[in-house]
Regions:
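CBM-like carbohydrate-recognition segments
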Residues: 9-10, 27-66, 78-81, 85-92, ...
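Extended ligand-binding groove/face enriched in aromatic
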Residues: 93, 102-238, 373-374
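Extended ligand-binding clefts on enzyme/binding-domain cores
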Residues: 174-175, 181-302, 309-320, 332-378
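Secondary-structure edge/capping motif, primarily at the C-terminal ends of alpha-helices
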Residues: 75-79, 263-266
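Extracytoplasmic/secreted envelope proteins and their assembly/folding machinery
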Residues: 39, 72, 128, 148, ...
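Bacterial Sec-dependent N-terminal signal peptides
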Residues: 1-26
């Protein structure tokens, strides 16, 4: 961690017109926190949640909208407790209106198909825990039961890892750990009453993380490759290891966020300890691949400084969020460095004009195989579209801000 401490100590400490709060100073009831500022910026850009992620009013059960609305809901819930005591119903209504539109009175989820066995479709279910707590609407609980039922039947690799999707047989992508495991853990903690079954689920969750770590780990870098094909049949994978070619920044960011979110949910014990160890190993390797000038991370994580590579906002926001939260949970060291990383995240990627926050340099999408035969080589990753305010960056930016504001 020494190298990144030096890097981040030299980073710019104020962010392009964004007024940063001072750690430990509680905002007044009328003072807007940065996390709220980001939420309001998005709500002003997109007055209805069906317009998030470029969907232009299309109703769709998708992880990107669900991810961002989960962050909105976290801002809403934290604002309601001390020291803020602020009930911002506009945020709640914005979130609830989308979920009420996409889930009918019986708990049927619009355009959801269990037979797709997509881990992406589990992710939007996380906000349902909060909505159910706040409203008591049975349809939210029914929808959660549907998603949990999918996980009970999710196809698995020979080692027991969840397939990423039905269309990607025997493949585990780092993305999928975030999509499924936090929901899996929270459902078990809340609703699985049988202690033996709950314990078995916790063990299964740990197994998912360990399996994908073991099979995507690159011994030369200490980083994790984007994905692994247990069958060794995909054109994009190494014929011996099954690994994809590169460590993609956001893929590792998903994995780190999944770790801290699940660690927070697990009771003390072997599984929590093992997941904490995985997180610590990652944060031992990450500083070596940070940009020396900013401390932020590249689109293709294992090729820092290579021609065409660029500092990428979504991955950097995910790493900063997971670092701050890991420190709060007592499983990562480096509070001062994590705080500096947050400042650098804002100074590198965030601008503000007229109270509207913009997050720049977000990779829109990246994957492997599929109908576009995505190869996962270096040129593929650096040539995917880059845009502002991608939900996969906005959500982690909000969570990083919330963690910083709790210091």
């Amino acid at each position: 961690m020494k190298r990144i401490a030096i890097i981040l100590a030299a980073a710019v400490m104020t962010a392009c017109g964004v007024q940063l709060p001072v750690a430990g100073d509680a905002p007044s009831r009328t003072q807007e926190r940065f996390s709220e500022m980001v939420v309001r910026s998005e709500m002003q850009r997109f007055p209805q949640a069906t317009w998030l992620d470029g969907l232009e009013g299309t109703l769709k059960w998708n992880y990107t909208t669900g991810l961002e609305l989960k962050a909105f809901m976290d801002v809403y819930e934290i604002a309601r407790i001390a020291p803020y005591h602020h009930n911002d119903k506009a945020i709640f209504d914005y979130v609830e209106s989308w979920y009420d539109a996409v889930i009918d009175g019986n708990g049927t989820i619009y355009n959801y198909k269990k037979s797709n066995f997509s881990t992406d479709h589990i992710c939007p279910g996380r906000t349902l825990f909060q909505l159910y707590d706040l409203t008591g609407k049975r349809k939210y609980r029914a929808a959660m039961d549907v998603l949990f039922d999918q996980l009970m039947d999710q196809p698995r690799t020979p080692e027991g890892g969840f397939w990423h999707k039905q269309i990607y047989p025997n493949q585990m992508w780092l993305d999928g750990l975030y999509m499924a495991q936090p929901f899996y853990a929270e459902y078990a903690a809340r609703y699985v009453s049988d202690p033996s079954l709950r314990k078995a689920i916790y063990a299964d969750i740990c197994h998912q993380f360990v399996t994908v770590y073991r099979n995507t780990w690159d011994w030369q870098t200490g980083l994790l490759r984007h994905a692994w094909d247990a069958s060794l049949e995909s054109f994009w994978c190494d014929p011996i290891t099954g690994q994809s070619q590169h460590a993609w920044g956001r893929a590792m960011g998903w994995y780190c966020m999944a770790l801290v979110d699940v660690i927070e949910l697990l009771p003390s014990g072997d599984e929590r300890t093992e997941l904490a160890t995985l997180l610590q190993e990652i944060y031992h390797a990450l500083p070596r691949y940070a940009d020396p000038a900013t401390g932020m991370w590249y689109q293709v994580l294992d090729c820092p400084g290579r021609e065409g590579n660029y500092l990428e906002a979504t991955a950097s926001a995910m790493f900063v969020y997971a670092w701050l939260k890991g420190v709060r949970l007592g499983v990562l060291a480096g509070l001062d460095e994590a705080r500096a990383a947050y400042h650098s995240l804002l100074s590198t990627f965030v601008t503000e004009e007229g109270g509207i926050v913009t997050l720049h340099r977000c990779c829109e999408v990246a994957g492997l195989g599929g109908k576009n035969n995505r190869s996962g080589d270096y040129d593929y990753y650096i040539n995917e579209r880059v845009r502002d305010n991608d939900p996969k960056g906005i959500g982690p930016l909000i969570w990083a801000a919330l963690e910083y504001e709790r210091l």
